[in-house]
Amino acid sequence: MDNYIFDLDENVTRTPVSYKNRYGITIAADLYLPKDLDESRQHPAILIGPPYSGVKEQGSGIYAQNLARRGFVALAFDPSYNGYSGGEPRHASSPDIFVEDFSAAVDYLGTRPFVDRERIGGIGMCGSGGFLLSAAQVDRRIKAVATAAMVDISRMASKGPLDSLTDEARAAMLDDLAEQRYADFLNGTPALGPRGAPIGFDENTDPVGREFGSFHSTPRGYHPNSITQFTLTSSMAFMNFPLLTHIKSISPRPILFIAGEEAFSRYFSEDAYDEAAEPKELHLVPGGNHVDLYDRTDVIPFDKLTEFFTKNLA
């Protein structure tokens, strides 16, 4: 249970932990603490959800470690059905359960004696950005929300990239998924969809696939638990349940949207920013693409995140 894509900082401790969400699924997580943390006092804490199909040994662990270096208690977790977390079938995806995983992380952090449960914030990376925002709409224990390279998976599934999916194409997709349910039932196991990150890619690969492949399919970000695939029929739930319907209800708790200036996903952050109520901020990383915000510590604005959480978890 290792294969971390980054080295552990000498000033940080990392402890594997586990706990159950409200569905009884065991969540595997890593708790990061400053090595000199005074556990007799209560401290602010931040939970970090990984990119869609990512695991805690990748980008979310990098975020957790860097925030622990700056004095925060930080928790990186594997979503249900993925990584080292429990749940069957493997690699299923669910809007409700992935949102619940954030509240379960709050349950865990808020019951640690060294955590001030009134000062818990969260970071959602890529698809987890949408799940965290959705969780914060109803879970008021989450006092401050930041997203990095946010993607609204429900919008992507229902409308396609840049909302390009026509009504006819959507209906045809739903017909195919309905037939897939019959096939899964007869086979006794759900089929997986295509990889989001191609294993072999070159200059002829579509730019988004090439970008994901440059992270997930190379030594830069590869982890055996991050297969970048979900069960095919997972899309049906996302096509039926939009994640950000109540985003205005997060106010007056603050939201920080971070996106790469050159990211294909930038429009998700911009549109969510427009829909959200104050206080809110949109921070564009100059020259940054989508996966730059997964692991590039020279690009990820950790000083901005530290300022945001220090102010709003005071």
Q: What are these language model-derived features?
A:
Residues N66-G86:
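Conserved alpha/beta-hydrolase
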Residues G288-V299:
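Catalytic histidine-centered segment of alpha/beta-hydrolase-like enzymes
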Residues I250, L256-A259:
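Short beta-strand/loop motif that positions the catalytic acidic residue
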Residues A92-P113:
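Alpha/beta-hydrolase active-site loop
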Residues P113-C126:
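Alpha/beta-hydrolase fold nucleophile elbow
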